[in-house]
UniProtKB/Swiss-Prot annotation:
It holds the Pfam family NAD_binding_1. This is Probable flavin reductase. It comes from the Bacteria. SUPFAM superfamilies: Ferredoxin reductase-like, C-terminal NADP-linked domain, Riboflavin synthase domain-like.
Amino acid sequence: MIVDGRVSKIVLASIKNNIYKVFITVNSPIKFIAGQFVMVTINGKKCPFSIANCPTKNHEIELHIGSSNKDCSLDIIEYFVDALVEEVAIELDAPHGNAWLRSESNNPLLLIAGGTGLSYINSILTNCLNRNIPQDIYLYWGVKNSSLLYEDEELLELSLNNKNLHYIPVIEDKSEEWIGKKGTVLDAVMEDFTDLAHFDIYVCGPFMMAKTAKEKLIEEKKAKSEQMFADAFAYV
């Protein structure tokens, strides 16, 4: 489904690391399932972005974008800023992706996010909490350092208000003073679980992280391939 939209707001989620939340109001509601993504036409090229919001808010699309020093990342942010300032319409194509939330399942959930891969996880998490599902939800969010945990306070509050949500942030910088877990997000998962046979597992982050997660969790933690979901798995 192709619709037009307008950038309604851009929020700088992390000043130090240039992480942005982009909100796009669409002319026609987009029907999608939590965990799917949207293609945005940028300078003539279609670029995929995970939809960060819950499907019940289908009149507005939320994207999380990390702006590194790479030219492509900077160009993307510049495009959205220009669209906001100039109030021009942008083209969106959605929904896409097969790593959507299997809401009919009663299995506990393991959500693994790397960096701004949290956007994909956020849509799934919000949907689950809105439906008041009873099963446990384990959210592991891995970043290089704590300054990249741009949704940390919000997730901590959610975990306090929802007893079935277990939020575990993980940082890779072992030199940083940090009370929580250190290392890679996959290391933390491997350390905390012995048997994932009855879990539904959702993964989003760098391609190699997703690839390694699928291999190791199946081989060493009894995870079932048919209960693991990530857009990256289509290329593994």
